[in-house]
């Protein structure tokens, strides 16, 4: 009964947060005509305050980054406009440098050692290189050019930036931060992954840029050290340019604004997942776009009403698409699969469509223009992007779970470190709900490989495996 009460409260909170003007969904295939802070944005908090006196901070990120496929280094610059909507003057701000956590002599190492796990480190991790920031400039204040000094104090994965002048209530500043982030392959569970994909590297760009900490009315500054777990971010907009070697296929949070240049029709047809329906599992991928040393492409994305930005990139991604319908608008459902797995991902995009439509119908409408499920040896969620793995039918509950995170983690965006169960608990409930709605009460499985298993193995009941077993254990 207590479990059901928590679920009921979570559903009510979610519906209240995103149902205001839920019928007004922007054109899902081009940048909206309004900005995040506009009165025309149906999801901007000032247009639907939950109570008088409520406030939260606003962010506008502009990021340009190049990913070097030879060194595995992201070289970039963040330009962040930060709006102080609080009643407090802020003499300093904090940033998360998440990748700094995965090094020797950090809290993550201490946590592992206390559990009798001795980490091993890659060359960058061992050298203390995660996300490197050496200077922070204040280049504008309230939209006017500025040149204000800052001093930096770093405590592992949290960077404090002391300002020359406080940010007064109602003011905004624009912050410029050059940075480098290093992909690596140590034993610690970094979500920012690289791994070999054919003759090239696969990259998952997550928690990869300096991200300003949340300042909220309950906790003040959120300066929790990163331990490889949950997250919390301010809502706003992201304008991001990602430069890769020209043979890479990239997807990310937001609208791809130069789609015709990056993915012309002729190329899209060659990359279609249906072309590889009979490809043997793990067979060497074909070459669709030849690698030319020094030849680059820049992928340009814009996202609004999100609190984070992530990307995934692989020369061997092949693409499936389906269209979900939410409140009369289309939501593009994209499946990215490594070519050697394509035969077992043929239904991924269509299955994702069913997930989006089920949760939008039964809970509250999905508000973004697309959702991506990616074959990335993982199980993690970011706005509009899930990093997954496996194959059909065993990956179905994983896809449901990770896409389900878009509702509480994505659209509500609570402080997961402080109240982790709000997202994970609600999403576990969604996993069981979604599976039963789409496939029925029992898990879809491959036929048993021998007659004894076929005779004696009981069907896997979804409510038992996804909900009740957690209490029995």
Regions found by a protein language model. Give the residues of each.
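Hydrophobic alpha-helical and helix-loop surface patches within well-folded domains
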Residues: 27-28, 32-46, 59, 301, ...
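Early extracytoplasmic/domain-onset interaction patches
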Residues: 25-96
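Short, hydrophobic/aromatic-enriched beta-strand segments in well-ordered soluble domains
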Residues: 78-80, 84, 97-99, 163, ...
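Glycine/proline-rich low-complexity spacer/linker segments in large multi-domain proteins
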Residues: 105-119, 123-124, 180-238, 259
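A surface-exposed beta-strand-loop module
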Residues: 73, 83, 89, 118-197, ...
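Bacterial Sec-dependent N-terminal signal peptides
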Residues: 1-25
């Amino acid at each position: 009964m207590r479990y059901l009460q928590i679920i009921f409260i979570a559903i009510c909170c979610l519906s209240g947060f995103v149902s205001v003007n839920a019928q007004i969904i922007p054109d899902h295939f081009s940048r909206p005509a309004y900005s995040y802070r506009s009165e025309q944005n149906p999801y901007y908090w000032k247009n639907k305050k939950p109570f008088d006196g409520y406030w939260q901070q606003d962010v506008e990120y502009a990021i340009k980054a190049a990913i070097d496929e030879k060194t595995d280094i992201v070289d970039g610059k963040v330009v962040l406009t930060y709006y102080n909507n609080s009643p407090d003057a802020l003499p300093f701000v904090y940033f998360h440098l998440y990748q700094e956590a995965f090094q020797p002599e950090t809290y993550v190492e201490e946590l592992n050692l206390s559990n009798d796990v001795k980490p091993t480190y890659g060359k960058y991790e061992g050298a203390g290189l995660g996300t490197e920031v050496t200077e922070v400039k204040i280049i504008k204040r309230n939209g006017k050019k500025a040149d204000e000094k800052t001093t930096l104090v770093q405590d592992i994965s949290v960077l404090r930036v002391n300002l020359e002048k406080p940010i007064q209530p109602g003011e905004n500043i624009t912050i410029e931060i050059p940075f480098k982030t290093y992909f690596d392959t140590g034993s610690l569970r970094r979500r920012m992954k690289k791994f070999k994909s054919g003759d090239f590297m696969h990259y998952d760009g997550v928690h990869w840029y300096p991200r300003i900490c949340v300042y909220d009315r309950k906790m003040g500054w959120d300066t929790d050290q990163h331990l490889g777990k949950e997250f919390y971010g301010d809502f706003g907009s992201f304008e991001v340019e990602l430069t890769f070697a020209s043979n890479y296929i990239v997807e990310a949070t937001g609208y791809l604004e130069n789609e015709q240049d990056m993915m012309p029709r002729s190329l899209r047809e060659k990359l279609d997942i249906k072309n590889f329906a009979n490809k043997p599992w793990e067979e060497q991928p074909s070459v669709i776009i030849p690698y030319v040393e020094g030849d680059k492409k820049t992928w340009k994305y814009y996202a609004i009403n999100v609190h984070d930005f992530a990307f995934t990139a692989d020369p061997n991604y092949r693409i499936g698409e389906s269209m979900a319908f939410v409140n009369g608008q289309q939501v593009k459902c994209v499946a990215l699969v490594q070519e050697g797995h394509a035969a077992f991902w043929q239904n991924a995009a269509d299955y994702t469509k069913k997930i989006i439509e089920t949760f939008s119908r039964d809970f509250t409408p999905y508000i973004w223009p697309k959702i991506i499920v990616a074959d990335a040896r993982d199980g993690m969620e970011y706005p509009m992007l899930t990093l997954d793995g496996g194959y059909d039918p065993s990956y179905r509950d994983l896809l449901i779970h990770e896409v389900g995170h878009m509702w509480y983690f994505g659209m509500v965006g609570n402080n997961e470190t402080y109240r982790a169960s709000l997202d994970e608990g609600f999403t576990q409930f969604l996993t069981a709900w979604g599976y039963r709605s789409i496939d029925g009460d029992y898990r879809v499985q491959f036929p048993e490989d021998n007659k004894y298993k076929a005779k004696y193995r009981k069907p896997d009941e979804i409510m038992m495996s996804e909900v009740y077993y957690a209490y029995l254990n």
